[in-house]
């Protein structure tokens, strides 16, 4: 990406102050969604998506539990529970979250070398678009700083479902308001929300970096620090959290 090392959030051609969400006082209620589970395995490759998302979500929840600034919530009663996106959105909304992160893994056809990180915030025109887009930028910046290649425009993209139920991927430079729905979880939850594609489970190098046991811990730490930055809190040190990424 040309100029990808620039802080995306500092780009403002109008000269206006960068957007910052209004967050109130802690503790903050943060909902973590393991994107697949139960009878829904997700994508299979070097690692299985549901195992990767469960491992990452569990570690992220642990980090949030150890930080008094946060109350972690979940969209499933257990990682082995089968639940549709609509059911998970409903369970999340019942708990009045202030932010939601849905963790997924990407995949590609046999022979593809596709790799990298991308994430999807609530689309333009939705109530929580600005907050979601801001959080998505934090996630992408954190992943890039830890060695992930960012896909698309700065790792932040939009998804729309067309009439034939086909998905249309749109870069985040396209800010026009559209009627088509995006991911159900993003549309139906009552808070800012981002769906993150952590890595390609079908790419050995990608899966080793962010889909292995240590890779999931690394990604969880990145997500935790992005959550802290979103709410303006100081993250606990890795030593206090009982985690070393070395």
Name each model-derived stretch.
Residues 27-46:
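Short glycine-rich His-centered loop
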Residues 11, 15-20, 51-246:
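Active-site-proximal helix/loop segments of hydrolytic enzymes
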Residues 22-24:
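Short, flexible hinge/linker loops that cap or flank conserved catalytic cores
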Residues 3, 27, 191:
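Conserved catalytic motifs of the protein kinase core domain
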Residues 1-8:
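Short, small-residue-biased leader/transition segments that mark boundaries at the very start
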